[in-house]
Amino acid sequence: MRKSRLSKIIQYKLIEHFVSGSTARCAADLVGVNKNTAAYYFHRLRELIYRAVEDATPFAGEVEVDESYFYLTGYKGGRRKGKRGRGAAGKVPVFGILKRGGQVYTKVIPDAKASTLMPIMQERIVPDSIVYSDALPSYNVLDVSDFHHHRINHSRLFARGKNHINGIENFWNQAKRHMRKFNGVPKEHFPLFLKECEWRFNNPSPQVQLKQLKHWVKKHLI
């Protein structure tokens, strides 16, 4: 990765604003750089995050799985609307896996078919884990898999004891709330923004986020 031409001081100031959740335009005004410079630097930070989080280890124990849909350019956030799966026109489908009490993993998917979701679950979830899902038919394959499957029917029961997927749905809400501030995310950059949200969720401490970014920047950009 090519080194940045920005001074170390400017880079660290931009990192602090990135961690705080500022937009590139706001950070540019506060640091005193061109808005395009700040936007490009934020893009490079997201590239570093993307590379780092892809090395996540598989989850074991109690795991929640769910799919959600994101608007891109013109994105307005909010909860799922309209049809799911192939009928979700104008939206990008994303699959998420969350270990209860732990971390989340996300992946942009072409569709929410069983043939798409099952290989991801087999790669990212340890066999014999307990998997909670909603009633989407694509998850029926879990009934004859190496996982212990519990299905939640939202129309009849939202949450009772451990029988829920509140954790992954909480992540969706956080991710969409974060992306709303950008007033639209280009399709080609959406995976980077998604992994940024994943990273923030998995590392909720700003101090930890700052430390990790400075470490990666020192290694790759300075």
Stretches with model-predicted labels:
Residues 1-222:
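Residue-level recognition of single "structural anchor" positions
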